[in-house]
């Protein structure tokens, strides 16, 4: 016990003697079983409770893929932890793995190499003053991972002491990490890819990514919030293109089963002869072409959620088998006798009126009531008012990033055009319209002539012209150019006329043709 005083630094305001029992327990596990999970559990508990660490992480280095993967952590949400994948030499963690040397950042705010890859700092009000310690997990001269910690230090000596403590913890952990990497070399790379995919999917399907603040959409958000923490079966109703899959994903990725699979199946995408095999799987030799055992979508979704889109397109035969799964959570593969039990959530969606289908005998009544436990109806885009402009701006911003095209806005007259259109294809149609217009735009603005003919409406004051005729199209362009000039020059007719290459008198005549008033633009 001669080393005890080294860690009893009570003059620093914190004592480190209480880490010794846990350190001893870690070393015993490392010697007797080498169970990495148990060792890391103690390690993280020690950091959190006895070292007052705000966020702690253990990463593992997969030499084959070159990835450094966040293996375990605390202080991070599942979405943040999912982003914890680094390359050799990338950021502080990547540099520690590359050099095998510990790195201490006294103040995160002042260190440009600190990537904040997980995005966790965005939540904290005083996180700019946090310190960051990262030490390598070494076995001989080989780096196998890192241990890192974030916390607020007001004492440089205590910071130095904790670097030493973490280095001892890393040494104690090293043998178990080495064994784990040898036994799970393929799983580490797979874990990195799974984390990346879960993070990407979680971001895509979080409720914040369902665009819209109209009253009908606020009601949808309230229903999602009500059902998200349960395992209740959900039936999502709405026209094609309204975003039923986004709502299903938002429910799954914010539920207790978020770490489980989210399996999607379109019931209208395959012929009746193969749907049963796709959903429930099949045994080897169960039919011509069944050359091996295959798991179905329900087995793949075990522990998570299965999303059955276009459920109204199922045949009555398949409906009967789906009803059994909903009632008993069990089924048999095609050609098999073994009953398979699954624990999962079912979310179904349709653009059909299932109640009418029940009445005319094309949809099973029992199945309808099993699915219709918690219905969520997504309104069509034409009923969402201001959401049309919000969505259009969102798509402009997204496609600008994805395509590398500099488009700043949609012209004012065309915003009116977007709002007056009925959008039979809903959000999907709007997305396609904006993507097309982005490709056609040349001056950073989406004009009316960039939109498809189906959106072109007759111009005010030109009701005699056919809506698809040349005069109407030219009038639409002229109307838009005048409105843009008036808006740009805040209703100053002289400046607007100069901008358009007209006299103020001619501009006034053209404005009269379209019932435009310069005062509306001041």
From Swiss-Prot:
InterPro entries: AAA+_ATPase, GAF, GAF-like_dom_sf, Homeodomain-like_sf, HTH_Fis, P-loop_NTPase, Sigma_54_int, Sigma_54_int_dom_ATP-bd_1. Residues 35-177 form the GAF domain. CDD domains: AAA. One of its GO terms (biological process) is phosphorelay signal transduction system. ATP binds at residues 238-245, 301-310. Keywords: Activator, ATP-binding, DNA-binding, Nitrogen fixation, Nucleotide-binding, Transcription, Transcription regulation, Two-component regulatory system. Pfam families: GAF, HTH_8, Sigma54_activat. Residues 22-183 are annotated as: A domain. Residues 493-512 bind DNA. GO terms for molecular function: ATP binding; ATP hydrolysis activity; identical protein binding; sequence-specific DNA binding. Residues 210-439 form the Sigma-54 factor interaction domain. SUPFAM superfamilies: GAF domain-like, Homeodomain-like, P-loop containing nucleoside triphosphate hydrolases. Required for the expression of the V-dependent nitrogen fixation system in Azotobacter vinelandii. It is required for the regulation of nitrogenase 2 transcription. Interacts with sigma-54. This is Nitrogen fixation protein VnfA. It comes from Azotobacter vinelandii.
């Amino acid at each position: 016990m001669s080393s005890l005083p080294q860690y009893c630094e009570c003059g620093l305001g914190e004592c480190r003697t209480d880490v010794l029992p846990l350190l001893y327990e870690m070393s015993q596990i490392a010697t007797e079983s080498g169970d990495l999970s148990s060792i890391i559990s103690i390690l993280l508990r020690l950091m959190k409770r006895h070292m007052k660490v705000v966020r702690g992480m253990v990463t593992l280095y997969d030499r084959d893929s070159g990835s450094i993967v966040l293996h375990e952590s605390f202080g991070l949400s599942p979405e943040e932890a999912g982003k914890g994948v680094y390359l050799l030499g990338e950021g502080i963690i990547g540099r520690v793995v590359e050099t095998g040397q510990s790195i201490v950042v006294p103040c995160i705010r002042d260190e440009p190499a600190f990537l904040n890859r997980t995005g966790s700092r965005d939540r904290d009000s005083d996180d700019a003053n946090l310190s960051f310690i990262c030490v390598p997990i070494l076995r001989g001269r080989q780096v196998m991972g890192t241990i890192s910690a974030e916390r607020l230090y007001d004492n440089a000596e205590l910071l130095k002491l904790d670097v030493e403590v973490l280095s001892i913890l890393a040494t104690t952990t090293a043998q178990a990490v080495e064994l784990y990497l040898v036994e799970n070399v393929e799983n580490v790379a797979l874990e990195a890819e799974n984390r990346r995919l879960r993070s990407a999917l979680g971001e895509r399907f979080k409720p914040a990514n369902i665009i819209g603040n109209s009253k009908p959409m606020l009601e949808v958000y309230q229903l999602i919030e009500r059902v998200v923490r349960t395992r209740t079966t959900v039936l999502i109703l709405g026209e094609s293109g309204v975003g039923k899959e986004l709502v299903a994903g938002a429910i799954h990725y914010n539920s207790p089963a978020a770490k489980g699979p989210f399996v999607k199946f379109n019931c209208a995408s395959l012929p009746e002869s193969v749907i049963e095999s796709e959903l429930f799987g099949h045994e080897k030799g169960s039919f011509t072409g069944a050359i091996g055992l295959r798991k179905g979508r329900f087995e793949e979704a075990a522990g998570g959620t299965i999303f059955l889109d276009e459920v109204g397109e199922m045949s009555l035969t398949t409906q009967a088998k789906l009803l059994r799964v909903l009632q008993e959570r069990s089924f048999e593969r095609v050609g098999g006798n073994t009953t398979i039990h699954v624990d999962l959530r079912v979310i179904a969606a349709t653009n059909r009126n299932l109640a009418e289908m029940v009445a005319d005998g094309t949809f099973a009544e029992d199945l309808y009531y099993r699915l219709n436990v918690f219905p969520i109806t997504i309104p069509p885009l034409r009923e969402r008012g201001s959401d049309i402009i919000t969505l259009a701006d969102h798509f402009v911003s997204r496609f600008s990033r994805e395509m590398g095209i500099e488009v700043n806005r949609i012209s004012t007259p065309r915003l009116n055009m977007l709002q007056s259109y009925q959008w039979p294809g809903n959000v999907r149609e709007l997305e396609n319209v904006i993507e097309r217009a982005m490709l056609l735009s040349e001056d950073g603005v989406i004009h009316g002539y960039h939109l498809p003919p189906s959106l072109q409406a007759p111009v005010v004051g030109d009701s005699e012209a056919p809506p698809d005729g040349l005069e109407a199209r030219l009038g639409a362009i002229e109307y838009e150019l005048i409105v843009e000039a008036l808006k740009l020059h805040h209703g100053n007719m002289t400046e607007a006329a100069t901008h358009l290459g007209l006299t103020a008198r001619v501009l006034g005549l053209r404005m009269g043709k379209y019932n435009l008033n310069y005062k509306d633009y001041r």
